[in-house]
Amino acid sequence: MAAAINAAVPSPPVAPSAPPPPPPPLGQASDRFPSLVLELVFSYLDLPDLRSCGLVCKRWYRCLHGDKNSDVWRSLCCRIVSEEALRTDILCNLRTYKAKVRAFQHGLSSSDCSRNVFIKKNGFTLHRNPIAQSTDGARTKIGFSEGRHAWEVWWEGPLGTVAVIGIATKQAPMQCQGYVALLGSDDQSWGWNLVDNNLLHNGEVNGSFPQCNNAPKYQIGERIRVILDMEDKTLAFERGYEYLGVAFRGLPKACLYPAVSAVYGNTEVTLVYLGKPLDG
């Protein structure tokens, strides 16, 4: 009888379980990772992923960009920059791993150059094959439409009759017949011929550079620093630590690429992006 009575009594209602708490906002969750853990994770990522991580929160951005020689940049540099470039003096004027990674990203393009040249495995040096009656050039992977930028260029072989450094738009040709000053041969490029010191644009000579009497000739291996100012629309040059002055003014509001052109067979030209120029 007692069992029947107990069976008739309804069980008390079971309270519904509370829903789980919502996850903390991403910014708060990211703050929980120790800096050493963040650096360890970041050290396995490629550059596009690192860019994305830098946008997550201020702490991640500081972790990535606060120390330009951190394990994050050292790991990435050792993975993408060739051993030759790191071992030799190619990058001797770049003091941090981050700067070396950036220089590699701005190197000469193996897909935007004459068919008669190739970019060596170090990622910074152009080699011109011994092709007769041809002028051959290359542009960098990245161009500039704003800001101030500097890069170094030097020849590691004979110049021949024409050896030009300068800038070019994406429309400027990178190969032509004969031995000519390819950079500066049309309105899409601006160049300085290191052989005769002439400035060239739109197929015309725009005077001699630098503007001094008995200007010294370029010596093989000598590093020339190129300074592009897209705010003032000027292109200037330095030799060693000597500022040679502005070579071109009134540059267009367009995307301009560092570029070189060469004519001598088996000569080599190296270009290294330095970043923002140091004033003074």
From Swiss-Prot:
PANTHER family: F-BOX_SPRY DOMAIN-CONTAINING PROTEIN 1, SPRY DOMAIN CONTAINING SOCS BOX PROTEIN
B30.2/SPRY domain span: 86-278
GO cellular component terms, semicolon-separated: SCF ubiquitin ligase complex; synapse
Extent of Pro residues compositional bias: 10-26
Region (Disordered): 1-28
Pathway(s) where this gene product acts: Protein modification; protein ubiquitination
InterPro entries reported for this sequence: B30.2/SPRY, B30.2/SPRY_sf, ConA-like_dom_sf, F-box-like_dom_sf, F-box_dom, FBXO45-Fsn/SPSB_families, SPRY_dom, SPRY_FBXO45
Record's protein name: F-box/SPRY domain-containing protein 1
One GO-annotated biological process of the protein: proteasome-mediated ubiquitin-dependent protein catabolic process
Record domain F-box: where: 27-76
Pfam family, one: SPRY
Domain of life per record: Eukaryota
Assembly and oligomerization: Probable component of a E3 ubiquitin ligase complex.
Protein family per UniProt: Belongs to the FBXO45/Fsn family.
Keywords of this entry: Ubl conjugation pathway
